[in-house]
Amino acid sequence: MINTFNPEVRLAIHDLDKVGPAIPLENYEAALRAILTGKASPVETASFLASLHLTKAEEVPDILMQTVQILKSYSTPIANIEMVSPRFVDIVGTGGDGHNTFNVSTASAIVAAGAGLWVCKHGNKASTSASGSADLLMSFGCDLLNVTPKNIVSITEQCKFSFLFAPMCHPTLKNVAPIRKQLGLPTIFNLVGPLLNPIPTYARIIGVSKLSLGEVVAKTLLKLGAGRSLVVCGEEGLDEISPAGPTHTWLVRDGTITHEVYTPESFHLQSHPLSSVASGTPSANAILLEELLSNMLHANHPILDYVLMNTAALLHVAGMAESLREGVKIAQQSISSGAALRELSNFSTISQQP
């Protein structure tokens, strides 16, 4: 345990107390690097993260951009992934919305892969919900600890859907994981997590849990030079495209940000209350996912429509579908043909190989 004061972290905490979001970026960087390399005490780390949250400094695009760049500088590199495909996509939410819905981003990623997109999802176990993306895939038999930056290239050569378990890619985050859990507050790491996929991403959907964060994350993506990106937030604070009502979206493309509101009618689908798409345990969600991918859910089933909406949006932002409604048709074909289920089964099998 660190018993001495860390001057960089103490200075940053002082800056946050005095000027909040106007903290000098060089002081912020020095403090974050000290924390990530284990040179700060748990109390200093907790104080720093809480100060970022309470002063809303964590919602400043320049600070978010710098955080992403610093974390990626410590991440495990992945070589030659562009030889597999130059157009990988991802769909992920920040989490922490409190609605505890079915793992729609994971299901949508699989359906999109069945439709022909190269999808490498980057995620973790649940922190606030009943079932995170990693929990769900592990319940389906995927050995995520066997999927590493060293073998992900060979895995993606064999299947269009793959998943990188975040702790395998960002070893320095182990220094803050227990502190984040004990702190009980959302931290800056919740916001930047969806931006840390080590696979170069051509197109993506990122869900945020507060409407005020939509433009913040969109501006951060713009500063990072990200490709086609759609930031989404359901009007009720859902970090996905909502099946219950309006969803605010911010499209980042060609150096601009365009705001638009989607509704279930935009997809030519029915609306459903969030209670009808609630999450179960990881094992229960795995059973439901298999039923979905086996084309066993009836037309207009809430979970099916929820997945179709989010998949269609990913297909649209990636350029595979010219419209949201065309995206729905492509997603339906991915499920009914069995292609989506084959992608998941293939990844599960390959992930278990020595």
Swiss-Prot record:
Recorded metabolic or biological pathway in which this protein acts: Amino-acid biosynthesis; L-tryptophan biosynthesis; L-tryptophan from chorismate: step 2/5
Broad EC category: transferase
Record keywords, A-Z: Amino-acid biosynthesis, Aromatic amino acid biosynthesis, Glycosyltransferase, Transferase, Tryptophan biosynthesis
MF GO annotations: anthranilate phosphoribosyltransferase activity
GO biological process: L-tryptophan biosynthetic process
Known EC number: 2.4.2.18
GO CC terms in record: cytosol; nucleus
Amino-acid biosynthesis as UniProt keyword: yes
Reaction catalyzed: N-(5-phospho-beta-D-ribosyl)anthranilate + diphosphate = 5-phospho-alpha-D-ribose 1-diphosphate + anthranilate
Disulfide bridge positions per record: none
Family stated for the protein in its record: Belongs to the anthranilate phosphoribosyltransferase family.
Stated name of the protein: Anthranilate phosphoribosyltransferase
UniProt organism field: Schizosaccharomyces pombe (strain 972 / ATCC 24843) (Fission yeast)
Encoding gene (name): trp4
